[in-house]
Design a protein with these regions (language model features):
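Hydrophobic alpha-helical membrane-insertion signals
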Residues: 3-86, 483-523, 527
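Active-site-proximal, structured, solvent-exposed surfaces of multi-pass membrane proteins
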Residues: 11-14, 60, 653, 657-791
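Membrane-embedded helix bundles of polyisoprenyl
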Residues: 29, 117-134, 140-222, 234-254, ...
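Active-site lumenal/periplasmic loops and adjacent helix-entry segments of GT-C-fold
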Residues: 35-172, 196-200, 283, 294-307, ...
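Periplasmic/ER-lumenal interhelical loops and adjacent helix-loop junctions
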Residues: 52-64, 96, 232, 239-329, ...
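Contiguous transmembrane helix-bundle modules in multi-pass membrane proteins
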Residues: 185, 204, 335-496, 744-791
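Membrane-interface helix-loop-helix junctions at transmembrane boundaries of multi-pass membrane enzymes
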Residues: 225-233, 322-346
Length: 791
């Protein structure tokens, strides 16, 4: 790739080079992924990576593509069933990159993941360039800074999470629009980019709002922003307008998240001020000097919260040398203050958590914002020849020293289990490789500085060439460590998901509703089949799922993974088939589970049918109170819930006459034989038909007497129900499932799901868009009048 000539011709304040940066970043991203695409392609597979990228991102994009085109509000394939908007707005619903993939058939979506990744790298670089060119006098160095941002350690690391790159790509445009609004009084773009970023990801937008406040205060304090009351009011109006335009998904998400225990995790005591492990501080420190390791691995440090945190501020070649120089020579500049404030935030837990609504769970997923400022500071100092001669050499020496100091952890004596070894790193070979690549970057930068005078006017082009070339090298190392570290585990991923799905659907019956179980298979198999599966990986499912599962012996954080030993849950949740990968059959047989019969097979799976399957929707002869249920162990809870319906005291008063209170003797009869009898009883009391729809479900029941009908569907405020056309109360039973009272005789039961808050938030968004359109038209007319008067 030739970099020079007209591409990097020195122009200050001249023609924008946005598209040059865009295509340059796109080309390097293509080169970065191409070798891995070829390797996967040789097996006839699309690019698959590791961890969340495979388990969530590919399946989410493919499933959502199909779901959106078919329409609907309720997703049966999402765990036990969840509202589509609330389950996927964090991941993709508001992403412009996802909506681009709707141009393709859903079966093609996995093949579009890499082109979308390349596009995100390009959009990120282009946006960073547009923002930086105001602050960096030389256009050539603006391009360098933009490419540093596009290929920062944060960006490369978060390929693993895919949708995080949407945020990285779009944020610089909002920051540029803020500068334009304050410094140039160009007000039209800021509300638009606020709306785009909020719609794209409400969770990350919370952190962006905090960073923008830090940025704004530092810019005012540093004298860059000159404010008056009128301008401040205009900015407040634009901010509110942008938030209103982008709030279409915010209200439904907020209503769901406030019920999600993962989002309500406050600090306590020392937790506000200090991390629980000293190694956490060391990990944060070295994240600036060493290229990032695979997100799912620990190497240099073992204690603390280190995996999947996005903890890296690494910049290819230049590292943080530019930031050190900038903070030394321009210490009063707002950028220096911003970087110092962010540094303090990184080391103080409660300040770090400001970017995540004060949640105590540790993440560093806001680092991309100070990284953008760091890239600009680097470009601003590199364009000063005198700094390259003096300050940069000292800063680079300090960076080299800090990077090499990590060797101490590879050489310190370590005694474990009576054996003394050298070093505390988990995988010495991987550590030395990471150190070698990191020091290669330092060495290349030293050479660039050493030959700066000889390069003269070609120095910016040389730096850009080396940055992009090294980004390819270290990016390849990182992608390879991450991808091939799970190579054997993920070798059959495409075959057992995307390729196998049509074959499985051809074998599995579709004449009646049922759920699936998947024994030790790849995550989210149900999404590929568009069927409900009790094994599921998604953080933002219906909150009732997170309430229900822990009460029946299932840990529910980001995954639903009921163990095979909890056999009674399969009856309660209407699981009819278990899919067992053929290489896992031996482990499955060791479980020695009763009641499962091999009925079919496909290329990769054996299919076992549950002879104790209970259709969806059934009644009980007994109920159990919350007080009595608390005495039941979690492992036996499923057995008890097959005997009796769990009711609150208030529900007992209203519906207790329909059933008998479960006796202690009955509660203690929890053998497998008792379970079989309970399944038979529930099956005999089941509704005569059940149909899952894209907006809920319908059922027909013929009851001998009035009773509550349980549906093992997560309770959600968005559900309304009618029985024989008459509105009915939806009851929350069994710590998170739904039931409705039906009279004796024949009943038509209809549950309809409307995403709570969606209609109102869309109305606010639509109204704000109208206001925005009128406002922009007024601004445009005013500008034309001013131009006419000047002419």
């Amino acid at each position: 790739m030739k970099i020079g000539g007209k591409l990097l011709e020195h122009k200050t304040g001249g023609r924008s080079r946005y598209w040059q940066v865009f295509w340059l970043c796109f080309a390097v991203a293509v080169a970065l992924f191409l070798p891995h695409c070829i390797i996967d392609g040789l097996n006839g597979d699309f690019f698959h990576y590791a961890g969340d990228f495979n388990d969530q991102q590919i399946s989410f994009y493919s499933y959502a593509n199909n779901f959106v085109k078919q329409g609907g509000s309720f997703s049966w394939a999402t765990d036990l069933g969840s509202g589509f908007v609330n389950s996927y707005s964090f991941y993709l619903c508001g992403s412009p990159f996802f909506w681009l993939t709707l141009l393709l058939p859903y079966r093609w979506t996995p093949w579009a993941m890499v082109p979308m990744l390349c596009l995100k790298f390009a959009v990120a670089g282009g946006g960073a360039y547009l923002w930086m060119r105001r602050w960096v006098k030389d256009e050539r160095w603006s391009m360098v800074g933009a490419c540093l941002y596009a290929f920062s350690g944060f960006t490369v690391y978060n390929v693993f999470f895919n949708h995080f790159l949407d945020v990285v790509a779009l944020f610089p445009y909002m920051l540029k629009a803020l500068d334009d609004a304050v410094l140039d009084r160009r007000h039209g773009a800021f509300p638009f980019w606020v709306a785009v970023n909020l719609l794209n990801n409400y969770f990350f937008f919370a952190g962006q709002a905090v960073f923008l406040m830090i940025y704004f205060v530092c810019m005012v304090a540093g004298g860059r922003y000159k404010l008056n009351l009128r301008l401040f009011g205009a900015l407040a109006f634009q901010t509110v307008l942008g938030c209103c335009m982008g709030c279409a998904l915010l209200v439904p998400a907020a209503l769901s998240l406030v019920q999600n225990p993962r989002t309500i995790d406050p600090f306590n005591g020392y937790g506000y001020l200090v991390y629980g492990s000293a190694q956490q501080y060391l990990a944060i420190f070295y994240s600036a000097f060493l290229m990032p390791d695979a997100p799912y691995l620990k190497d240099l440090f073992q204690e603390g919260i280190l995996k999947h945190t996005s903890m890296t501020v690494y910049l290819p070649v230049v590292g943080i040398a530019g930031g050190l120089v900038f903070c030394r020579v321009r210490r009063r500049h707002p950028f220096a203050r911003i970087m110092k404030v962010c540094l303090i935030c990184a080391f103080v837990p409660v300040l770090n958590s400001m970017f995540y609504a004060l949640n105590s769970s540790y993440y560093a997923r806001w680092y991309y914002m100070p990284v953008l400022v760091l890239c600009a500071a680097t470009a601003m100092t590199l364009q000063k020849a005198n700094l390259c001669e003096t300050e940069y050499r000292r800063a680079l020496g300090l960076v080299a020293l800090c990077t090499l100091s990590s060797i101490a952890f590879a050489l310190v004596p370590n005694e474990k289990d009576g054996t003394t070894t050298i070093g505390v790193v988990e995988e010495p070979l991987r550590y030395w490789g990471i150190l070698l690549v990191s020091m290669l970057g330092v060495g290349l930068f030293w050479l660039l500085l050493h030959y700066r005078r000889q390069l003269a006017a070609r120095f910016p082009a040389a730096v850009l060439s080396v940055v992009l070339g090294f980004s390819f090298v270290y990016g390849q190392v990182h992608l390879s460590i991450t991808k091939y570290g799970q190579w054997y585990h993920d070798a059959d991923y495409v075959q057992q998901t995307w390729r196998e799905a049509p074959e499985l659907n051809a074998v599995l019956p579709d004449d009646v509703f049922y759920r699936l179980d998947a024994y030790d298979s790849y995550n989210n198999l149900g999404l590929w089949l568009d069927k409900s599966c009790i094994q599921f990986f998604n953080s933002t499912v219906a909150p009732s799922i997170l309430e229900f599962y822990p009460t029946v012996g299932v840990k529910r954080d980001v995954n639903s993974k009921p163990e095979a030993s909890l056999y009674a849950l399969r009856g309660l949740l209407s699981v009819r088939y278990t899919l067992v990968p053929k290489e896992k059959v031996e482990d499955w047989e060791k479980e020695k589970l009763e009641g499962w019969n091999l009925v079919s097979s496909t290329t990769s799976y054996l299919i076992y049918e549950n002879e104790n399957w209970v259709p969806m929707g059934f009644t009980y002869d007994s109920y159990i109170t919350e007080e009595d249920f608390e005495t039941v162990s979690d492992t036996n809870a499923g057995n008890v819930l097959m005997k009796a319906l769990l009711l609150t005291d208030e529900q007992v008063e209203r519906y207790g006459q329909m059933m008998q209170n479960l006796t202690d003797d009955e509660k203690n009869n929890i053998s497998y034989e008792d379970y079989v009898q309970d399944c038979t009883a529930r099956r005999e009391s089941a509704v005569t038909s059940f149909t899952a729809t894209r907006t809920g479900f319908t059922a027909q029941a013929d009851l001998e007497a009035e009773n509550l009908v349980l549906f093992s569907v997560p309770y959600d405020d968005g559900f309304t129900a009618t029985v024989n056309g008459v509105p009915a109360e939806v009851e929350k039973v069994d710590n998170g499932l739904m039931a409705v009272a039906a009279p004796a005789g024949h009943s038509e039961i209809v549950f309809t799901y409307h995403t709570a808050g969606l209609r109102q938030s869309v109305a606010v968004s639509a109204g704000a868009i109208v206001v925005y359109a009128v406002w922009v038209a007024v601004l445009h007319r005013k500008k034309r009048r001013e131009e006419s008067s000047v002419g």
